[in-house]
Amino acid sequence: MPPLKRSLLIFAALCAASLTSAQAAQPSVDPEFAADVVDRYANHIYYGSGAIGMALVVIDGNQRVFRSFGETRPGNNEHPQLDSVIRIASLSKLMTSEMLVKLLDQGVVKLNDPLSKYAPPGARVPTYQGAPITLVNLATHTSALPREQPGGAAHRPVFVWPTRQQRWNWLSTATLKAAPGSQAAYSNLAFDLLADALSTAAGKPWPQLFEEQITRPLGMKDTTFTPSPDQCRRLMIPEKGASPCNNTLAAIGSGGVYSTPGDMMRW
């Protein structure tokens, strides 16, 4: 099967699963089952991780189980809570994928739309022997783009580079070493470009679109790219010298989301 067609089928299956799982009837479950499993394995997971702290949310049918371990910051002796703020990093990509599914369902975009359709005026999107980068390539790590944009200062804070303008400027000078859809290679850059494209297609800034389509309907009040002073005070810090509590609008699609265990439980 051609790589692009295979990618489309895989992505379509993922989309279908994500849309139908929430619609399925809630299964009958043992009321103690989820809690028993969590209590059996959670300590092992935490102590084997080497993490400063861990918040664990498990949803099984209509059960919701929350457990926390360790500290929210080195030496503060405070366990993570449901409202502890966490950088969810690459789980942000699942929310970007959800946005793609929603806009597909609304007829705003198509999987095979070329990225160039949503490029800023004057920007160039590279092709490989005429084969374009499509939205499904970006979403399935088959875009032939690198994992990260080359350059950037060493030891910089996380999720603040490259900005939208910087990545599109770089893309205009980039070349592809393989045809999009021909091979899989993980790319954070691709997911930020995907979010840019979806924002353009919807005609709204990504934070507004993100709030309207994902966080507001579910009451996810602590899920954001621009944390407030109160949210920054609740941010879990893994080590001294960790990245400051900045806005992370540069990494809208790949990893910039701040959230809480409580919000992730709603999602």
Residue ranges and their predicted role:
Residues 73-74, 126-267:
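Short, surface-exposed loop or secondary-structure junction motifs
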Residues 29-86, 108-110, 169-174:
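Short, conserved catalytic-motif segment at the N-terminal edge
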Residues 22-27:
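Boundary at the C-terminal end of the N-terminal hydrophobic targeting segment
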Residues 42, 56, 62, 93-96, ...:
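Residue-level preference for non-acidic, small/hydrophobic
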Residues 48-55, 75-137, 176-189, 252-255:
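Short active-site loop at a secondary-structure junction
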Residues 9-18:
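Bacterial N-terminal signal peptides
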Residues 1-9:
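Bacterial N-terminal signal peptides that target proteins for export
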